[in-house]
């Protein structure tokens, strides 16, 4: 069924999580980037339009600065023996890493797609780009303009500026605008993009083969769930595996994304991006995932 969906879909959003993009040591996986670019190029040769939602700015920032980030609950970065430190609290450090890492991330994507004579375009989004009608219309127009010219849009949240836990700026030093709220995770961002663009398919690549009835990393008897027709019935009753320090989402955000898009008639596939050639394997029917079917 997943193979048939790929064959029929003309407009596909592919979301790539940090867990998928990062190697075990936290550095971006160049081989995965190359595989993904090759698969997207193949899809485009078949007449499909592809939008990529890519996490990984913080991971790329860590790699670029040759330092280690703080633990998930920590406040700040450890000193690196040759590079010193990035001072500040946890949120400020993450934003600084994202500022450095986003440039590194898009550079690596550009190189990966250039091998297939494909150009990429960068979108750094905020929640208001989807909640404000004028800004949403501009996003949709620019996406369409690029796609008509066979450019691959690569989207991420503007993590260098969007954060909910940094100190507020004094009133006399800020412009009087409504406070910015984060999208918070790229599962949600990819769902927003799929809805705005009216995609035919949303693919979420994670580090596990879809949804299970319990955590497969902790339970050997965990059962894979290949098909979901009622997202609400899964809430609190399923698992995707243990969380990874590189990611911000989890099973809850993926179920939220599935709920949003399936209500709009868009199918969602959750699959493992760590397999060899994950996208092409799904297209051939050689890889398994969880398919969330649209609400009828």
Swiss-Prot record:
Gene3D superfamilies, from UniProt?
Acetylglutamate kinase-like
NCBIfam families recorded: proB
Cite the annotated pathway.
Answer: Amino-acid biosynthesis; L-proline biosynthesis; L-glutamate 5-semialdehyde from L-glutamate: step 1/2
Query: What is its biological role?
Result: Catalyzes the transfer of a phosphate group to glutamate to form L-glutamate 5-phosphate.
One GO cellular component, as annotated: cytosol
Q: What is this protein called?
A: Glutamate 5-kinase
Instruction: Tell me the enzyme class.
Output: transferase
Q: At the top level of its lineage, which domain of life is listed? A: Bacteria
Which Gene Ontology molecular-function terms are recorded?
Answer: ATP binding; glutamate 5-kinase activity
Tell me which family the UniProt entry assigns to this protein: Belongs to the glutamate 5-kinase family.
Q: Identify the coding gene.
A: proB
UniProt binding sites for substrate: 55, 159, 186
Its catalytic activity?
A: L-glutamate + ATP = L-glutamyl 5-phosphate + ADP
Q: Which Enzyme Commission number(s) are on file for it?
A: 2.7.2.11
For this protein, the record's InterPro entries field holds: AceGlu_kinase-like_sf, Asp/Glu/Uridylate_kinase, G5K_ProB, Glu/AcGlu_kinase, Glu_5kinase, Glu_5kinase/COase_Synthase, Glutamate_5-kinase_CS
**Which residues take part in binding ATP?**
15, 206-207, 248-254
- Compartment list: Cytoplasm
What is any one GO biological process for this UniProt entry? L-proline biosynthetic process
Keywords linked to the UniProt accession: Amino-acid biosynthesis, ATP-binding, Cytoplasm, Kinase, Nucleotide-binding, Proline biosynthesis, Transferase
């Amino acid at each position: 069924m997943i193979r048939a969906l790929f064959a029929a879909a003309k407009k596909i959003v592919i979301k790539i999580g940090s867990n998928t993009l990062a190697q075990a040591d936290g550095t971006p996986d160049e081989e995965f980037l190359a595989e993904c670019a090759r698969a997207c190029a193949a899809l485009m040769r078949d007449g499909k339009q592809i939008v990529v939602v890519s996490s990984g700015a913080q991971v790329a920032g860590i790699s670029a600065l040759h330092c280690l980030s703080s633990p998930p609950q920590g406040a700040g970065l450890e000193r690196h023996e040759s590079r010193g430190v990035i001072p500040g609290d946890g949120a400020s450090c993450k934003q600084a890493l994202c500022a450095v890492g986003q440039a590194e991330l898009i550079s690596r994507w550009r190189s990966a797609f250039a091998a297939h004579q494909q150009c990429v375009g960068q979108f750094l989004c905020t929640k208001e780009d989807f909640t404000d009608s004028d800004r949403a219309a501009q996003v949709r127009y620019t996406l369409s303009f690029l796609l008509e010219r066979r450019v691959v849009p690569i989207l991420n949240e503007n993590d260098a500026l969007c954060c909910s836990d940094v100190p507020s700026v004094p009133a006399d030093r800020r412009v009087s605008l409504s406070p910015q709220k984060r999208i918070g995770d790229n599962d949600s961002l990819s769902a927003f993009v799929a809805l705005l663009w009216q995609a035919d398919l949303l693919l979420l690549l994670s580090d596990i083969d879809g949804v299970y009835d319990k955590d497969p990393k902790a339970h050997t008897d965990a059962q894979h769930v290949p098909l979901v027709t009622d997202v609400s019935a899964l809430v609190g009753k399923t698992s995707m595996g243990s969380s990874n320090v590189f990611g911000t989402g989890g099973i809850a955000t993926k179920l939220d994304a599935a709920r949003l898009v399936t209500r709009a008639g868009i199918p969602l596939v959750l699959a493992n991006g760590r397999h060899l050639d994950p996208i092409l394997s799904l297209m051939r029917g050689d890889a398994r995932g969880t398919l969330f079917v649209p609400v009828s």
